[in-house]
Amino acid sequence: MDYQNRAGVRFGGGGVAGYQETNAARRERLRKLALETIDLSKDPYLMKNHLGTFECRLCLTTHANENSYLTHTQGKKHQTNLARRQALENKKSQENAPQVLLGISQSHVQVKKSVVKIGRPGYKVSKIREAESGKFGLRFQIKYPDIEVNAKPRYRIMSAYEQRVEAPDRKFQYLVVAAEPYESIAFKIDRAPGKFWSYWDAPTYTIQFFYNLTKIS
């Protein structure tokens, strides 16, 4: 580019390029760089229409040739729209992620190991009395010689309205004991026991409690 005839420039010296020339040179460098690094055949936003011109589907602009389109892709409008599209896609992926994780966790929860039951365990029920208070209670000793390795029996108190074996009687509740691979067993007890205690000393599981009474029927 000849800058010799510019005002204020010495003859034979290099002139200072103006804004338009500098900007044009910059666009040309970007275009050449884009030609070397961008494969237009893989650009999802480039479309050649029936008139032979090129369209940017992201910005809805029309371009006479590939060079014009490449120049457009380096501009502010195209880069801004690309950033917005990427942000939108990231947001959608984050919204979908919890649903996928939730589906996986639910599938794990629903998986239940199938255990072949081997029948009811042997047990012994005894009436007991606390020496200090004189209160009476019950002791349950249940045998689990074939319990699963590292397993431990469990118990829970069931209300009369949860069971389906007898007509509900609010004066009673049920002590339910379970241990794989044995069948669960239940004992009908008075409604309000006091002190409660359990102990597992394989193969015997012991449960005992005392009523707030000084006699027991």
From Swiss-Prot:
Signal peptide: none annotated. Disulfide bonds: none annotated. Its main location: nucleus. InterPro entries: Matrin/U1-C_Znf_C2H2, Matrin/U1-like-C_Znf_C2H2, SF3A2, SF3A2_dom, Znf_C2H2_sf, Znf_C2H2_type. It is found in: Nucleus; Cytoplasm. Keywords: Cytoplasm, Metal-binding, mRNA processing, mRNA splicing, Nucleus, Spliceosome, Zinc, Zinc-finger. PROSITE patterns: ZF_MATRIN. This is Pre-mRNA-splicing factor sap62.
